[in-house]
Amino acid sequence: MAAAWGLKTLVIDLDPQASATVSIGVDISNCKTTIYDVIVDGATIQDSLVSTSVKGLDLVPASLELAKAELRLSQLDEPDTAMRKACEAIRESYDAIFFDCPPSLGVLTSNALVAAESVVIPVQCEYLALEGLSALVQAIDVVRHGRNPDLEIAGIVLTMTDFRSNLAREVAEEVKRFFPGKVFETAIPRNIRVAESPSFGKPVCVYEPHSTGAMAYQLLAEEVAKRLLDKGGLEAVRVPSGAVEGPTP
């Protein structure tokens, strides 16, 4: 969405499952250099950049080798600073840089937290997700009191929601009660277009821009941009509010 607004955008995929890489339509087998080579072997981000089919969007792809990165990084004196050091050379080249993290609190996620300015936390509307949320918030506090005192939680987004379910409503209320003012108004619903867009190698906002899921991501992006603007974390964003109309399933 940031790229659609004319922002030069970079996605860095830190998930060994490479979900972001695949979803954007990049074939990992064609990538000679990945984020593993950057944070473990000292390659530069410039060496691993991949242009995507989305105008203004670049990617640093993940690879299955990332599963070994935790062990390699843990042997370093400062295992959680590799990503921040690698980003120093390219920060001024992009308007927005996003880290896609694995669903665990290991060294890869720590590297992203040390390098980032803000965190957007996705939470599925399931009870087990609440424990993971609490652990992540505690990890963010540790990083904030250590290597990255400027790190902030931009907000929490409820995902895969179906508010016809009592469970989904109860979990949403619980998250809002424990984290007042942090939960975005926009929730991402369960939507077939969101689920199938990765198989076509396109973000849902490109694959089916008028779908309910794409509309939700558009509204969420506007909320995130507004919060970052209010905090001074984004110098200028021209958000075409309401540019997409007429949602379809």
Go through each PLM region and give its residues:
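P-loop NTP-binding core
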Residues: 1-249
